[in-house]
Amino acid sequence: MSKPIVMERGVKYRDADKMALIPVKNVVTERDALLRKPEWMKIKLPADSTRIQGIKAAMRKNGLHSVCEEASCPNLAECFNHGTATFMILGAICTRRCPFCDVAHGRPVAPDAEEPQKLAQTIADMALRYVVITSVDRDDLRDGGAQHFADCITAIRAKSPEIKIETLVPDFRGRMDRALDILNATPPDVFNHNLENVPRIYRQVRPGADYNWSLKLLERFKEAHPEIPTKSGLMVGLGETNAEIIEVMRDLRRHGVTMLTLGQYLQPSRHHLPVQRYVSPEEFDEMKAEALAMGFTHAACGPFVRSSYHADLQAKGMEVK
């Protein structure tokens, strides 16, 4: 029997070390090894990376993190080249260990009390008009990190009064009442929390999370702020069916969610959950049509769509795919 991994505080555990801690193991089959990316999944990189390096330098200078880098997002080059990024607060170490996600797992250090001001100054320096703020899960904090979100929102608005802020929050497991009390006092312009996938395979995809808890979080925020858009997203290609995706969309509408994102799951490494199928652009178009018919005000559905991909355009109801 192998010895359990003893996690050191502040150390990032990734790939094999991270997956070794997950009770649901990833067994690679011959079929998984043969599954190749179709042509529509090919990305063309920009010829000039000057702006990309500039954003990375600004992040490093202020000790900030982007989910674009930490989660190995396939859209990083495009978004950075257009001068946009999704900021990840509360460090780069997550207390969860979801096998689809490339963010490091471990025992995080205490939150940086100066981060809200650093973040606000960086955003002001970049002259951003729309910003997405997300975080790792912080099950070690009594409020799950909600006060840190609120502090960041307050600091950003103080330096950039005209900015629109979208928060992509964790589930605040076991701390929903406390977290919502804090967030309701300093609400964002868009409230986002991702379901990620369908109930049947939730234990495999999001160990430690609960499908109905996440729906309740979205519903309760919407009840407190009916004027603020609520948003959620799923990754597809993990073994779910299109019919199951449609049913999740219905659940989201029943809980008051008004914006939807659907995108193709891509395996970050061989240690992560394998891609079970590639959903075609035509299927994404069909699911978008279903979403709009259900009453979503906007649905961004496409192979490269991610929750914060062109989030400013999504918020305006413009076409994103």
From Swiss-Prot:
Keywords: 4Fe-4S, Cytoplasm, Iron, Iron-sulfur, Metal-binding, S-adenosyl-L-methionine, Transferase. This is Lipoyl synthase. It comes from the Bacteria. Transmembrane segments: none annotated. SUPFAM superfamilies: Radical SAM enzymes. It is found in: Cytoplasm. Signal peptide: none annotated. It catalyses: [[Fe-S] cluster scaffold protein carrying a second [4Fe-4S](2+) cluster] + N(6)-octanoyl-L-lysyl-[protein] + 2 oxidized [2Fe-2S]-[ferredoxin] + 2 S-adenosyl-L-methionine + 4 H(+) = [[Fe-S] cluster scaffold protein] + N(6)-[(R)-dihydrolipoyl]-L-lysyl-[protein] + 4 Fe(3+) + 2 hydrogen sulfide + 2 5'-deoxyadenosine + 2 L-methionine + 2 reduced [2Fe-2S]-[ferredoxin]. [4Fe-4S] cluster 2 binds at residues 94, 98, 101. Residues 80-297 form the Radical SAM core domain. Binds 2 [4Fe-4S] clusters per subunit. One cluster is coordinated with 3 cysteines and an exchangeable S-adenosyl-L-methionine.
